[in-house]
């Protein structure tokens, strides 16, 4: 309509008028104006813009059933021009103009879509009248009070009383005797319905506090059913007469029987409430898995009372399978303690099980010894985050104690005390009893609240480690104590542990703090270890350990080593490293295959513990002058190494392992975990019998400023390494008259030559991928010569570049050459020409002859060495699958006669300059100057020590026959 406002005096016509005019006078109709005029007129003359959704005018003859008649209004307003030439008809330009006009008009004048459906909105309904007039409410409330609202408490109650239906409902008995009314929905008990109490009604609002009891008692059958089922579900085959908890809730209120019975229960629980604290505030003497503590009563009869503990959800699922007497209120002496004395434990260990009072905070424990203390909680205040570490599930629903006792009958297996598992048949040693076994001269250095601990191999049913049936560590009586000044501690803290591995990897974050008595002379004083848990998620309180008795074994060592004597840790299912340490004083080694391991691998390799003295794994600058196996370190952390370095043939003296400086050197390694094992056996030598183990092996992966002190004795014994790989046994013979010291030290370590053991680097389970060019190991022999390598050994990617070194220090007596075998090849009986060729086909090896030259370990590029490259390359070994690549495999050496030079082949080799990556043609890059002195076919021409380095993925079975034939050929 805005288009018609442009002319003065003209009025817009309605559509009806337009239709009438078009029918009567079609020729006199005004032509439509151009579009620009319409726009101009509308824009100029309209005072305000048109409404977008104004109501459309309904034409008078509009039919709702036929809405198409009104749709053509735009066509009526803008009809198509009549063609000028009737013969040709209308032109496309006319069509376009009319189409454009109609569209623009329809867009500017939107109209509502007419629908045949009529929606009628009714007015709001009137509010209902109140139930009673307002004047009555005012009169009842009094003139001085405000009239209460219609929804107040009093009006609602009056309305309920006045209502006949409601009054009849509450006046009738709630629980009639008729069965029809019992099945009626009105008889269902509800806590939110008003009740009659002393003739007065109570409000609708639910009241806080305890719920009201039913006024009428149900039938005796229903009461017996509910009480019997509820108690039977809690504890099977034990008759109970009380509810499982002292607190009332809606469930127990609806299922309880009567008010009189509940009163007797409450009176009964007031006496037992003292000895049953709420979960998770557990008592110190309470086992985390045993809530039905078995304790013989004074009369010897079984009493059927239940210590009604409100245990947690985990404890309800891990109830032990033992059934028997429980703590009752008739025996007041046993009240407050929950120390079980299992009959199976007494039968196995053969010790009388006396009940031990719980060790409360600030109370000195009594001097009673019992095997039944194995289920004590290791700390009085345990962080709830550590609860999952203590609840290790036992197989087939039985207790862990029964499972452990069935492992071995001759030895007492015990779990590691840092595991916090409640099942280890050990003997608690208090301060007084522990001090009684120590000479008075050594008691001054003993802490007042320390206890002897035996963190031997875990025997719990955990997926972390397997079950070990024999004691893990036995120490000679002459190598036990350490000085007081060397307060050493190990804090092996490795990488992050996943949340799903907290229970199984409880050994992965262990801080074992150790102390020892102040004595430089050898004695049988046991060491002191105080394990504490290092935080995995945040800070965790230190864990007080359970004292254990360290067994002393006097059995003579066997002359040969069997593969089954090596204890294997199976089922290494954790992805975090773990530490297993042991301190057991013993006069002699019981089993020759017992080894010491620092397990940091997930490959399930064999790990064992050697017979050695106190293992102090930690950070300390001091190194005692005693013949002990000690693990001090400068650095607080030990990084993960991607190799399995197994030191077999370790004759016990002093072992020193320092952590790496850096962990960012594992560049091409997919699995960052490894296994570092130290194995030692005590066996008689060739010429003498039962000589003491006094040789020293010092192993350090970092740097240490303190030199190693030589041990007091220099007798070396012949030893055979155990089957470290679980499949093979390698035997390396050593002349008893000669000795040398083998050590892996960092570059800046000053090491004095000490009596020795023979070192065999056993087969690695994980290969070192290519690009391992850092951490140059150096084979160092300061006594006679020094040999250095320029790059990384294929199996030893430890440390940054130029930060760690691998040195083999040996002391050469009587000018006799000994060889330390690194790799899978043994020394050859003879050599060919200018190069030492391997006897077996497909056996790559590197033999390095050490010249008489000594350099510093830090200047690795200047270190002289001689490298003999061979036909085969290390690529053939390194490119295999990971389970077949054995960069460093320990293979038994050939005969090394006593007092005779070793049959080690020498040859003049080709110098190889520069550092070579581990994935190149040679396994390790070495800076190799020329050989000082040519070595021909005679293997005995030079008396310098030689080092055979190489790898071979062959098995021992395929290798031994060929070697035996070649050896016979040499003899002929």
UniProtKB/Swiss-Prot annotation:
Location of region: Disordered: 1-67, 281-302, 328-359, 406-431, 676-726, 953-972
Under InterPro entries, the record lists:
Nucleoporin (IPR026054)
Where does this protein have compositionally biased stretches of type Basic residues?
40-57
Q: Where is the signal peptide?
A: none
Q: Where is the composition biased (Low complexity)?
A: 413-431, 697-706
Pfam families the record matches: POM121
Q: Where is the composition biased (Polar residues)?
A: 287-302, 339-352, 677-696
UniProt superkingdom: Eukaryota
Q: What are the cysteine partners in each disulfide bond?
A: none
Task: Give the family, as the similarity comment puts it.
Answer: Belongs to the POM121 family.
Name under which the protein is recorded: POM121-like protein 2
Origin organism is: Mus musculus
Gene symbol here is Pom121l2
């Amino acid at each position: 309509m805005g288009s018609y406002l442009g002319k003065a005096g003209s009025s817009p016509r309605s559509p009806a008028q337009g239709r009438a005019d078009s029918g009567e006078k079609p020729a006199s109709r005004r032509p439509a104006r151009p579009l620009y005029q319409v726009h101009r007129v509308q824009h100029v003359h309209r005072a305000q813009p048109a409404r977008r959704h104004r109501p459309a005018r309904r034409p008078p003859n509009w039919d709702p059933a036929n809405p198409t008649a009104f749709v053509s209004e735009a066509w009526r307003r803008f009809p198509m021009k009549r063609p000028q030439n009737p013969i040709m008809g209308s032109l496309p330009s006319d069509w376009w103009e009319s189409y454009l006009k109609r569209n623009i008009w329809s867009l500017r004048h939107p109209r509502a879509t007419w629908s045949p459906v009529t929606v009628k909105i009714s007015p709001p309904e009137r509010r209902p009248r109140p139930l009673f007039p307002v004047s009555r409410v005012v009169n009842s409330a009094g003139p001085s009070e405000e009239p209460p609202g219609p929804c107040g408490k009093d009006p609602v109650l009056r309305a309920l009383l006045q209502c006949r239906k409601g009054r009849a409902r509450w006046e009738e008995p709630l629980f009639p005797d008729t069965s029809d009314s019992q099945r009626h929905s009105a008889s269902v008990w509800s806590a939110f319905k008003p009740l009659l109490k002393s003739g007065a009604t109570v409000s609708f609002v639910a009241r806080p506090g305890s719920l009201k009891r039913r006024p009428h008692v149900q039938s005796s059958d229903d009461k017996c059913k509910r009480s019997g089922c509820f108690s039977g579900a809690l504890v099977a085959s034990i008759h109970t007469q009380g509810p499982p908890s002292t607190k009332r809730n809606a469930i127990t209120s609806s299922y309880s029987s009567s008010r009189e019975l509940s009163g007797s229960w409450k009176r009964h629980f007031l006496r037992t409430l003292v000895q049953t604290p709420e979960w998770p505030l557990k008592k110190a003497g309470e086992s985390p898995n045993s809530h039905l503590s078995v304790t013989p009563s004074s009369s010897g009869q079984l009493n059927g009372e239940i210590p009604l503990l409100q245990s947690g959800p985990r404890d309800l699922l891990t109830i032990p399978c033992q059934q028997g007497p429980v703590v009752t209120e008739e025996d007041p002496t046993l009240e407050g303690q929950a120390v079980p004395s299992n009959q199976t434990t007494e039968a196995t260990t053969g010790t009388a099980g006396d009940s031990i009072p719980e060790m409360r905070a600030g109370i000195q424990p009594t001097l009673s010894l019992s095997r039944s203390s194995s289920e004590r909680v290791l700390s009085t205040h345990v962080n709830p985050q550590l609860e999952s570490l203590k609840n290790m599930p036992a197989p087939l629903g039985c207790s862990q104690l029964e499972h452990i006792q069935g492992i071995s009958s001759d030895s007492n297996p015990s779990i590691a005390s840092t595991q916090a598992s409640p099942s280890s048949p050990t003997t608690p040693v208090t301060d007084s009893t522990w001090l009684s076994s120590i000479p008075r001269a050594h008691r001054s250095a003993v802490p007042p609240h320390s206890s002897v601990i035996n963190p031997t191999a875990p025997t719990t049913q955990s997926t972390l480690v397997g079950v070990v049936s024999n004691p893990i560590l036995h120490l000679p009586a002459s190598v036990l104590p350490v000085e007081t000044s060397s307060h050493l501690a190990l804090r092996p803290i490795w990488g992050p542990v996943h949340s799903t591995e907290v229970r199984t990897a409880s050994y992965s974050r262990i801080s074992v703090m150790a102390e020892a008595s102040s004595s430089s002379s050898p004695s049988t004083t046991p060491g002191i270890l105080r394990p504490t848990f290092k935080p995995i998620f945040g800070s965790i309180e230190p864990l007080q350990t359970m004292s254990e008795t360290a067994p002393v074994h006097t059995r003579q060592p066997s002359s040969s080593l069997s593969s089954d004597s090596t204890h294997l840790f199976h089922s290494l299912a954790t992805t975090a490293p773990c530490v297993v340490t042991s301190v057991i004083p013993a006069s002699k080694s019981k089993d020759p295959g017992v080894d010491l391991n620092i397990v940091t691998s997930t490959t399930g390799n064999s790990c064992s513990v050697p017979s050695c003295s106190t293992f102090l794994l930690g950070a300390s600058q001091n190194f005692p002058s005693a013949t002990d196996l000690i693990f001090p370190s400068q650095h607080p952390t030990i990084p993960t190494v991607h190799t399995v370095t197994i030191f077999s043939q370790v004759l016990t003296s002093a072992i020193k392992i320092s952590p790496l400086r850096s962990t960012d050197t594992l560049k091409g390694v997919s699995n960052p975990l490894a296994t570092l094992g130290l194995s030692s056996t005590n066996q008689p030598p060739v010429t003498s019998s039962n000589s003491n183990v006094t040789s020293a092996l010092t192993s350090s992966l970092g740097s240490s400023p303190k030199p190693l002190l030589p041990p007091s004795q220099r007798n070396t014994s012949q030893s055979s390494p155990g089957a470290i790989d679980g499949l093979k046994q390698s035997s390396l013979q050593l002349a008893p008259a000669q000795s040398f010291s083998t050590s892996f030290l960092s570059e800046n370590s000053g090491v004095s030559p000490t009596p020795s053991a023979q070192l065999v680097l056993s087969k690695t389970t994980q290969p070192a991928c290519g690009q391992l060019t850092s951490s140059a190991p150096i084979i160092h022999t300061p006594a006679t010569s020094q040999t250095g390598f320029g790059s990384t050994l294929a199996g030893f990617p430890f440390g940054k570049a130029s930060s760690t070194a691998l040195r083999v220090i040996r002391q050469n007596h009587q000018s006799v050459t000994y060889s330390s075998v690194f790799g899978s090849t043994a020394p050859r009986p003879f050599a060919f020409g200018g190069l030492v060729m391997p006897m077996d086909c497909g056996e790559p090896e590197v033999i390095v002859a050490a010249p008489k030259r000594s350099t510093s370990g830090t200047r690795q590029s200047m270190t002289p060495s001689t490298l003999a490259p061979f036909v085969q390359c290390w690529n053939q070994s390194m490119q295999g699958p990971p389970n077949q690549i054995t960069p460093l495999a320990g293979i038994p050496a050939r005969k090394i006669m006593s007092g005779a030079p070793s049959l080690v082949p020498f040859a003049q080799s080709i110098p190889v300059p520069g550092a070579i990556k581990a994935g190149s043609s040679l396994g390790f890059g070495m800076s190799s100057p020329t050989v000082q002195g040519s070595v021909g076919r005679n293997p005995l021409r030079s008396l310098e020590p030689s080092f055979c380095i190489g790898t071979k993925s062959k098995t021992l079975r395929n290798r031994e026959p060929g070697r035996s034939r070649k050896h016979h050929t040499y003899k002929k």
